[in-house]
Amino acid sequence: MTEQRLLWGTGTSRTLRARWMLHELGLPYESRPITSRSGETLTPEYTALNPSQKIPALQEGDFVLTESAAIVNYLATAYGADKGLAPPTDVRARARYDHWCFFSMMELDANTLYVIRKHEDLHAIYGEAPAAL
C-alpha cells in the first residue's frame, strides 16, 4: 500500500493513539493538525471525510477510517506483523487482545472523562455529570 497517508487531528489522547501506532510501525504519514471544538471538524471538507465530525481520522488514498481504536487495530493488522504488533489469528487469543483494547477504551478512558467532567470544566461542553451512587 503506497497511497498517501494522512492523519487528521491533534491535541487529544485519541489522536495520540493513532499517531503513536504510526510511529511504532515506522509508517510515513502527513499530519492535518485540526483540533476538536475549534470548528475545524465542522468544515465541509472534513465533514465529507468524516460525517461524525470527530477526530482522529486516518486517510489512505480513498480509504477513510475513524475512531482511534479502529485505526490502531487496522494499522496493527495491515502493517504490524513484522514488528509483532498484529492481532492474533487464533479466535480465543484475538478475544483476549480485543478484551484489553476495549478495557483501555471503556474502563480507563471513560472513567477519566467522567472524573474530568465532574471535577473540571468539561461540564460546559458535555453538561453536568450525574452523581455516582
Describe the function of each predicted region.
Residues 1-130:
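GST-like domain detector, emphasizing the conserved glutathione-binding G-site
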Residues 133:
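Aromatic-anchored helix/helix-loop segment that forms the rim or "lid"
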